Amino acid sequence: MAIERYIGIMSGTSMDGVDTVLVEIEENSIRLMGENSFPMGEDLKQALLDICLGQSTNLQAVGELDHRLGHLFADAVIALLENTGISPDSITAIGSHGQTVFHSPETQYAFTMQLGDANIIAAKTHITTIADFRRKDMALGGQGAPLVPAFHQQLFSSLDTTRVILNIGGIANITVLTPNQPVTGYDTGPGNMLMDAWIHQHNGSQYDVNAKWAKTGTVNEILLERLLDEPYFKQPAPKSTGRELFNLPWLKQKLSGLDIPAEDVQATLAEFTAVTITNDVITYQHNERSELSTKQELLVCGGGAHNPLLMARLAAQLPKWQVMTTTERGVDSDNMEAMAFAWLAYRTHHNMPGNLPEVTGASGLTSLGAIYPAS
C-alpha cells in the first residue's frame, strides 16, 4: 500500500486550543510530519462551556457554534499546511473529532454531540474530511468511547510487557495492553478538568502551570473521600464520562459545609485524579502468583503528562510500574489524540473498522465516521 498523508484535528474536553497533526501512514506504520496548536478564542470557549454545563440554549446558538467551530478547525488546518509547506492536494483526508458538548451513552435515547461542521472544513481546506466518529459505535450499542485504544494497540502492543496507556486530558482514560489478552479501555474519571476549572475560577489562569498552586496546598482527606464516593467509580467497564458529570457545580456540592482554603482544594483535586487513575491501573497489576512475568509500564500522554505533581503521585502510588510519558516510547505525548483521529480517518477511508467492541461495548466491529468530499 502506498504512503498516504492525513491530518488529524483534536479539540478535547479541556478546550485549551485545537491540536492538528500531519502524518504519513503506510499500512502498519505512522510517522508524524508536522504539528501545530491553534488558539481558541475565550468567547468561543466560554460559549461552549456554557452549553456543556447545562445552561439554557437554543438551536440557533448550537448551530452557530457548529458553524464557528467548522471555520476554526479549517483555519487550524490551513495554518498547519502553511507551517509545513505541504499542499492540500497531497493530503488524502482530514480526520476531525469535533468539539464534544454532550456525551450521554447510558440513557434510553443514547447520544453524543460533537460540533464543528465538517462541510465547512472540507470546503475551506479543499480536503476530504471525515468526522462524526462516535455515533456509529453507539448505533451498535457501544459507548462511542474511548476510540483511541485501537490506535494505542497499533502502536504499543508488546509480547513481553504489560502496558497501560494513560491519557490525561480533561477526562482521564486508560488503554490496557496485556500480552495475549483482549484490549481493555475506559474513562477513569476527571483528568485536568476540575483542576483547570477551579484555578480559572480563582485567578483566571487556564491551568495550574507545573502544579505550582496545588503544591502550596494540603490534601483534605474529608473532601477527597467525598469526591471518591461518586457512583461512577464503582461502575464496571465499558464506561465513559465527561463534563456532564464532573464540573464545578458537582465540585461545589462536594464542598458543601466544608471551609477549605482554595489551594487545599486544588491539591485535593490533583490527588483525586491520581487516586482514581491508580485505583484502576492497580487492578491490572500482576500479583506474585500470576503466570505473567512481563514488565509493567504506565505510559502517560495528554496535558497531564506535563503536571509534575500528578506524575510524581502516580509513580509513588504505583511502585511496581515504570511510569513514563509516551514520548519516551517514541510517540509525542502532546499529539497522541490528534494522531489517533488521523489514523481513524485512514481506517475509514479504506473501509476498515476503527472501534474495539471489547472496549466500547458495541455489538461488532465497524468503520467509523462520515465522509465529506472536498468537492
Curated annotation (Swiss-Prot):
The keyword Manganese does not apply. It comes from the Bacteria. The keyword Nucleotide-binding applies. One of its GO terms (molecular function) is kinase activity. It catalyses: 1,6-anhydro-N-acetyl-beta-muramate + ATP + H2O = N-acetyl-D-muramate 6-phosphate + ADP + H(+). Keywords: ATP-binding, Carbohydrate metabolism, Kinase, Nucleotide-binding, Transferase. SUPFAM superfamilies: Actin-like ATPase domain (SSF53067). It is an enzyme of class 2 (transferase). CDD domains: ASKHA_NBD_ANMK. Pathway: Amino-sugar metabolism; 1,6-anhydro-N-acetylmuramate degradation; Cell wall biogenesis; peptidoglycan recycling. ATP binds at residues 12-19. Its EC number is 2.7.1.170. Pfam families: AnmK (PF03702). One of its GO terms (biological process) is 1,6-anhydro-N-acetyl-beta-muramic acid catabolic process. NCBIfam families: PRK09585.1-3, PRK09585.3-2. PANTHER family: ANHYDRO-N-ACETYLMURAMIC ACID KINASE. Belongs to the anhydro-N-acetylmuramic acid kinase family. Catalyzes the specific phosphorylation of 1,6-anhydro-N-acetylmuramic acid (anhMurNAc) with the simultaneous cleavage of the 1,6-anhydro ring, generating MurNAc-6-P. Is required for the utilization of anhMurNAc either imported from the medium or derived from its own cell wall murein, and thus plays a role in cell wall recycling. This is Anhydro-N-acetylmuramic acid kinase. It comes from Photobacterium profundum (strain SS9).
